[in-house]
Amino acid sequence: LFDDEYEWCKESVFEVNYTEIGNSNDWAGKANQGNSDIIMLGARGLKDPNNVYVEGWGFAPVTKALNDAFLPDDPRKWTTIIDHEEFRAEGGTISSDVNQYTGYSVRKYHPRAGYSSTVGTEALNYKNNYRVIRFSDILLMASEALLRSGGSVGEAQDYYARVVKRAMGDD
């Protein structure tokens, strides 16, 4: 869902568009049209033998509590989190000598090979769009609205169940 081939797919309701061709070298703001948040979320010292991911700066590490909140067979875990031990077991390297190291990084907005600019400052010009509202968010908001307004608990549960069913690939 977070690769560029899925930008503005049926799951996406609202996205902030970014481009890798902004040719910007200006750290003063987002006027460059590139997504500079991506480089910040990537793991430091990352070397990917499959050349999918590239090194980032290691900001905003994922907590162990978030990692552990996922069931082992939940596909959303793999989409959301890079487990550093699993990554190393597959032949990759990631530095653990960083501030606030947890052993986990954000996968969905991790820098990917080929997603940054060849002009301007690379770190400022990633093309990854930011998914602001997804269809699953709408379903969860509908569920919450029903519960908070005294609506049908059963209908609220149905909306929630649709989210889980879709995430598991059954919808």
Regions picked out by a protein language model, each given a short descriptive name:
Residues 1-33, 118-135, 148-159, 169-170:
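Structured, solvent-exposed acidic/aromatic patches
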Residues 42, 168-171:
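Glycine-centered secondary-structure boundary/capping sites
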Residues 1-97:
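An aromatic- and glycine-enriched ligand-binding surface/loop that stacks and positions planar moieties
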Residues 75-166:
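C-terminal substrate/ligand-recognition segments
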